[in-house]
């Protein structure tokens, strides 16, 4: 089967004032895969995800999705689609720190994730699918999301993103601040989303071992630069990766 390139990031750079957050980053995400990006805190991983959805403007390079230009710098000018168009095209981001709407119920949070949908029957069906997939959310659907545990809030953040039926799911540190068993549960759900719902996944994660074990392909970022790229199983055996990120 021929691999289809769903997301192409070509030589992009992003600045924060005088600080170069990303420098000449290039990478591909093939349709149907789980791709992991690992690196130390502050390496630029979250900035890359924000650039993909248009929250951080490029100063160089381009981002293409499903063969269509999303963002590019041409003649030193940044051109790109508004963020809501990115969602409409089939890209959903689960941000770092979950960022659920604390004063809304679980069900109302899911409604917020369905803002692009107009069919009430479809919205209802999508919510039921999420409650089946994350049973604890179904049990808590009338509770304010502030009352959920950290793991439950992360499940809600993923479910909210899935309400838009994305083809590409971006996850920013889904295991951040969670107990190891909960992180494993979250990643098992991510694999099911990929395998059963046929959603392509690009995950940024500091838990390098779990991220790479769950992925087909992997990249390593240091100081805003991609320094390694290989199949995830090969990166798990790479001595530099093992020493720097796996604690070996």
Describe the predicted segments one by one.
Residues 2-248:
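Glycine-rich phosphate-binding loops of nucleotide-dependent enzymes
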